[in-house]
Structures are given as C-alpha cells and as structure tokens.
C-alpha cells in the first residue's frame, strides 16, 4: 500500500510520471511524524524502507516463540489464508520488489493458486501471466537551463535554482521556447476555474505551481493537484513542456529534493519501448526553487502578484505570458525490466451478461530489501501490505468455486505488479486489458487490509460515487457489518490505490478496508506507527487475527457475488465528477 500523501507534489518531477513516488522516497522526518500523528500514513504510495530504520538496541532472540506462534494450528479457512501469507511474506521472497526474481516466483505461486481455485487463465497467450514492461528512468546528467530576458542569457544553477526532470519518452530533450505562467495549471469548470483563460500556450513552456487550492474538495483536490493531470492539461493546450515551481510555503520544499534528483523513477513502456506518460510530447523539464523562479520571472508584475496571492491564501491566480524564453537541454537514462500481472477468470453463466467482466484487484509487490532494523533485518516482507490482500483474493476465488454456482457475469481476479512504484501494473492493465475494455463494468480493490482487530464495519472508498455503494451496503449487512464513513475525507484516498487506474478508464470502482469503528482506529494507527513499510510487517506479528481475515474474505465475496449477479451493471451517479470526467457509464 502506498504511503499517505497529497497530490500537491510540490516541485518534484517524479510526481509527474507517478504521483506517488515523491512520498515513496523523499519523505522528511518532520513530515513523517506529522502524518503519522494524523494517521494519513496510507499507502496507496510507497515510502523508502530507509525512512523507518531503527537505532534501538538489539532485542532478545524470539525465533522459537515466533515459530511456535506462526505454526500453531488454525481452523481450515484461517489456515488456508495464512498459508498464502506464510509463503508470500517469507524471507525467501525478499519483499517481492517488482521486477525482481522473487516477485516472479510470487507471481508463479499466485498463478498456481488460481489454477487450484478453478480459475481460467486470463493473461497472455493462454497463460495466467500478463507481461508488464517496466521502464525505469532518471536524469542522465544535471542538464542545463538558460533563461533569456531582454536579450541577456542567464544560466540557472543546478541544486540552487533547479533540478532536472527525466523524460521517459526520449533520451535527449532540447527545447527553446517562451514561458507562460498558468497559476496552478488547473481547468475545473465545476469550480468555475480555468487557469489557461486569456493565455495562449501552444508551443510554449508552461510554468505552474504544485498542488491545488484548499477550497477544492478532498478527492477532487487530490485529482487537480496531481502533476500528471496538470501536465495532461498542458499537453491538451499544445504546450511544449512544463516547469514546476516551488509553491510559497510548500510542505515539500525544494531543498529537500535536491539530494534525490537522480533517483530512478518508473513507468511502463509502450510497444516502441518508450515510457508511458499521460501527457505525451509535453515533458516535465525541471523543478524550480523560489530563487530559480525569481530569475525566470524577473520583475514581471504578474509574478509578484501571484506569489502574494498564494502567500495570502487566495485560490485564484492571474495567468500571464512572461517576457522570458527558456532553453532546456536534458538527457535521460533508461533501463527496462519485465514483470507481470497475474490474471484468472471465472466465465459468466448468463448468456446476456457473461461478456461483462467484474475485475477484483490486489497488488502483489512490496518494497523489497532495505536498510537494516535493530535486529539487522533488511527484508521488508509486506505481510499485511499486501500479501494479505492477495491471500484474500485467492480465497475469494475459492468461495466462488465452492458455491457450486457460476456468477452471471464473468469475474476476473487480477494480482497487479508495481503498485509501490506508482500503480503501474494496474495502469498497464487498464490501458491494455486482456478482455475487451468496454466490457469491464466494475472494479473492487483490496490493499493492505489490517486484520489486527475485530472490525465492526467496512470502508468502501468511492462508494458514494456509483451504485456500487448500495451494493456494498446490502452485501456487508448480510455478514453482520455496516459501512463506515471515510475516516479522512480530506486526504482523497479514492484516488490513491490501484482501483483509480480503472476509474480513469471510466469504470465504477471501490476500494475496501476493514472499518475504523470501535477499536479499529487505534489498532490501525498502531500498525502504521510500528509495522507499516518496515521489516516488522511480518507474519510473526502477534496481533494478526486470522478469523478476522476470514470475515474480510467473506464480506468481499458477498460484495463481488452481488455485483456479478445483479440484473443491472454498476453505474456512476449522474453528474459525479470522476464519472463525468472519464465518460463513465451512467454519469452523463
């Protein structure tokens, strides 16, 4: 599961390629403590294991006690779930980093379990595996950025004025163009906002602030604050490139990112071997500090007005064409590694509905090997995140098999890769599905179900946006739990896990968690502060309640069964923002 973050990714070019990666690798200690205190530590975006390294004295060896607890007998349903986690979160899997040999072994394991559960292959060429070409990229050097105002060129200083962006589409990027300031780079008719109003950016470089104004709703603010979405808007306007500007008062200051300027980022590769980006042909060229922005804008009155407006908390900024040109010369280093999604399907039984597909997802990868903890443990096993979700997916498939009744619609079980790198496996499948795209009618996503307490309710992020909400409420009632409210709506969790890649294709989607009622919030917070994205997220965790895992599986099965057997396909609520934006069924 990805660590908590907002999509106002500051000035990081990484956020353009993958909105999750900034927090994954560059989370400051100050930020970490603040977010953990407010329990925003949700991984729909991954943190580097290094940020959680411990300096405590080595504890006593508890291996014998751990083995006794792990190997204690359980009822069959609990033991079946636990067995999957025992394998997937074992040290032999070395944290299941996407693209690693251990991830590939984990994928083969899931494929074998799909076969045992009676699922038909739904990957490539009659197999359970869908090949996913992962492309890592980073700036090959510091590049050069030169601002010219009034005929006088000024070369910006690396590390003080700018850090370069990588371009997964090209190895070499050369641009020399005028610059237009476009506020936050947002076009939002429902907020009566168009930051491109009155300016022509065709063939120009667009300079924008990161994030979105606080006047936007939580989930929609996360969407509009995404640098990937901003770049896509810039591309639609004909911009030649994007420059991200350090926002005054940013929680992600430029200085914190300089040490990480050349870390590897990741996307998926197209058939030509080039990296996929939402904004094709409009690369994010660089991120500018406040000092760099001052050199770019000089004494432009519009810039002075914009910085004052941001400092004063005013949401609307006036866009303007600057009197400057910017020449950028950048090089990108790339490397390819193959990974795979794992897809199995139960064919539908209703002649009129069997071609429609309900996709159930969970991510298989975790963060791999990292800095040692106090015990010297370097393997970040990812038991809860997300071996537990994969185990739930497999056991849910067995529920369908054991029911003796095929679903009316087809049901696909999809274990995706590289969630921790930016929802990449899910995005690849959503763009390149192994079933007809227009036949995918719903997605239900499982990511890091924390089963350390007896949950009294379930949270279905995104439920209110489509008829899936009514289905979830009816289904969970049959297993004795209610539907809780979003515990942190301002954080926009709806856009922060694999299901969002289906939303972006217009598919009604929900993301399920055990709820926070009763002792849930306290238990969830404890997991985040002691085990989340640490080497201690292991099956030896004495707080894991396997009977609650079975309850979670049963609730998910009932939800999926009702979606698959309903007379009507799921539909977006009429006028819903995401449904309308992505042309989803029922929204217009």
Residue ranges with predicted function:
Residues 94-213, 322, 334, 338-339:
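Noncatalytic luminal/extracellular "stalk/propeptide" segments of secretory-pathway proteins
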Residues 156, 269-304, 416-516, 520-528:
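Metal-dependent peptidase/peptidase-like ectodomains
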Residues 69, 148-150, 158-198, 275-382, ...:
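Soluble metallo-hydrolase cores and metallopeptidase-like ectodomains found primarily
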Residues 223-229, 250, 368, 374-467:
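Acidic/histidine-rich catalytic neighborhood of metal-dependent amide-processing enzymes
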Residues 157-276, 347, 378-381, 385, ...:
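Extracellular/luminal Protease-associated
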Residues 54-123, 355, 573, 588:
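N-terminal hydrophobic or amphipathic helices/low-complexity stretches enriched
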Residues 398, 402, 513, 519-582:
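His/Asp/Glu-rich mid-to-C-terminal helical/loop segments that flank catalytic regions of hydrolases
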